[in-house]
Amino acid sequence: MYTNNSSGKEKKSKKPLICRVMNRQIPILPRFISSTIVSVKERFQLFKSLIINYQQVKPLAIALGTGLLFLMGYFFCLPRPLFSAPISQVVEDRAGELLSARIAADGQWRFPAMDSLPQVYISSLIEFEDRGFYSHQGIDPIAVFRAIFLNLSQGKIVSGGSTISMQVVRMARGNRTRNVFQKIIEAILATRLEFGYSKKKILNLYAANAPFGGNVVGLEAASWRYFGKSPALLSWAEGALLAVLPNSPSLIHPGRNRNVLLDKRNKLLNRLAARGIIDPTTCDLAKSEPLPEAPHPLPRLAPHLLDRISKEKGYLRLRSTVQSGFQANVLDVARRHHELLEFSQIHNLAIVVADVQRGEVMAYIGNAPLAGADNGEQVDIITAPRSSGSILKPFLYGLALNDAIVSPNSLLPDVPMNINGYRPENFQEGYDGLVPANEALSRSLNIPFVDLLRQYDFGRFHYQLKKLGMTTLSQAPSHYGLSLILGGAETNLWDLCGMYASMARVLRHYPAYSSRYDPADFHPLSYTPTQFLEPTNINRLDQHSNQLSAGAIWSTFEAMQEVQRPGSENQWQQFSTSRRVAWKTGTSFGFRDAWAIGVTPEYVVGVWVGNADGEGRPGLVGTLAAAPILFDVFGFLPSTSWFACPFDDMVRAEICPETGFRAGQYCSVDSLLVPKSALNSKVCPYHQLVHLDQDERYQVSAQCFQPSQMLNRPWLVFPPLEEFYYRQRHPEYAALPPLHPDCQTQSGNDSPMQLIYPRQVSRIFVPIDLDGEKSKTIFQVAHRQASVKIYWHIDQEYIGTTQTFHQFAFAPPPGKHTLTLVDENGYRLEQRFEIILKKR
């Protein structure tokens, strides 16, 4: 009979979970449900079973834990990093040759590990130290048993049986005392080393840290110290010597028993020949090579570049773009000129040579060799801010051409100038009155460029210089003012060479890029290799430059190559060795800095000469001190070309031949090739139509002559002040004829007089001499007809008359005054001024 179970299910038996250990079923944990454990006895039985089970698995747990700890200890047993000794800093040339190195902090020459080792050294090292290097995993059992046998048979330790890996471990652990215990540790660590490093890496670690005698550590340092060459150039004799030397490094010193070292080397060479690694002839020749004598000094071709890399990059080894052979030649030039400059107590100089295409440095002379610590030999002048002198003028000239403020031949004023108290002077003193802009650049005249900067605006110039790559303009434009063009700002040789190279790069690429501009062409120089990439799509380049156009740059460089070269007496073009170079010099105020920078389509060369402490010296000028170095350096460079004319950015324009401006209606006309921007430049302001009598002796006007009696002639008329100085250098200049006596006196803009001093409303500081007397002030005026008489008045009081030479020395009392000048024809000129007394 079927009976219904109220629970619905039969109760399941309570069975513990079990695991099988060593073929035994061991309960681990029963189903722990509070409803199934109903008594204290059951709880006790459960706890007891757990204790018994733990006792049974304890040995296994200990074994597993110990093994895990051992594996972890083995995995982490090598020190991190493996070697922590200080490393020498090294700079290499483009080909990997050593340029300069700095000794490590612990006084050792210890170079960074090399990427690859020469085969002569690898073969020699493995044959001498560890023939089974490539077959073992850190321990060579055969070598160990051989060492035990030899040591027992000799009764002393003659072989350690150490592999190269074990020696690397020993060096990494500080070369601890050798004993059996240390050997065991080294063996264990050597196996771990083999697991973590490739065979090549282990060889590199050994070669970089092995002792080679004295304070020389590592193969590369030893190769340079003992043989004066890169490890890649080692002979078999040299490689074998360096393989055996770490075994007895003290034998390298002169005076020691060097025959032992020679014998070791030759035995190794014989072994190499016996194994067929070298042929017998090579072996005999190698054994005939003598041991090195006194250590060679390490190359010190670019110590300042090494210092700069250390500060800027922090790299232990850096391959630069410098070419060691060319660097050595330029260093010789620096040394030779430094010896001459020392006679004038000029102690420092710097030279940069760079490739234009990539902007990569080829030579880096940060200071004169042997200048001495007292004279700042350690200062890297290439990056040191110095007064620019007039070295920035080509940039202003190019920018002014670019913005149509001038054209290449347009005239700029060269007269005494006083702009809000700023009174620039030309280096050679004197005035031209008016001078073509390109001539002002080639002669480096100061006053015309101050006036040009006034027209361009010093704030704009400040902004453009920073865009071109000048990094030293730390002050606002107002801080520099118009002095920005004459050395009022500091710059450095690195920035300047980069800026000139960028201009050359733009002009060089313009025809190659289908008359387009790549903004990436403006960039600073680099002492590390760069990757020059041609634009993939020339059509996407800019049609217009946002900095300097090709036409403006070409015109600038054309003007710069007209500079007279030092010592050449203007005949340098006749020499077959001459080359076309656009170059500029500069001299700072007080003769503290002399600059010279030259550029061709291929190279830029920059030179600075002076004293690191800023002391000025007579004769410290760009053309005398820096330019000769510039052209000596160019003499070492390969032949150079010249820039192709950027015809697509040039245009033939009608130019006034006498003033260089666009021809006006009264000008004669020349058709000249000028930058396209010149089409927007000013029309000639100096040619005007004048009315003359029939004899062309006098000027006349409709007020006094019938039009039928007048002749109309175009005439070149300069302002009286400019004319005054222009006539002194240009006797062919024809001044305006005087006004006819029957005609009324003209005034205003037609006045034939113009004050030279004082100009505008000015304050005149008059010094008081030691005896208490006031110094006299010299007033000066320019007149178109120098022979006329001029009557001088101060505050309506007549003080005298001048004729031909219109200067007057007078000592007005302190205060405000009015100077009135009247010539014999009735022309009148007034100027207010103020006298302020100042003690000397």
Annotate the PLM regions.
Residues 96, 125, 168, 202, ...:
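Residue-level preference for non-acidic, small/hydrophobic
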Residues 85, 90, 97-110, 221, ...:
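Short pre-catalytic segments that frame enzyme active sites
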Residues 153-178, 232, 295-310, 406-461, ...:
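Conserved catalytic neighborhood of penicillin-recognizing serine enzymes
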Residues 140-146, 185, 220, 259-261, ...:
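Acidic/histidine-enriched alpha-helical segments
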Residues 2-4, 9, 14-343, 356-362, ...:
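Juxtamembrane regions of bacterial inner-membrane/periplasmic proteins
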Residues 52, 278, 420, 536-542, ...:
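Soluble, non-transmembrane domains of envelope/secretory-pathway proteins that act on or interact
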Residues 320-343, 351-355, 364-367, 372-381, ...:
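A penicillin-recognizing enzyme superfamily signal
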Residues 170, 174, 208-215, 232, ...:
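Glycine-rich, acidic and aromatic/proline-enriched surface loops and short helix-turn segments
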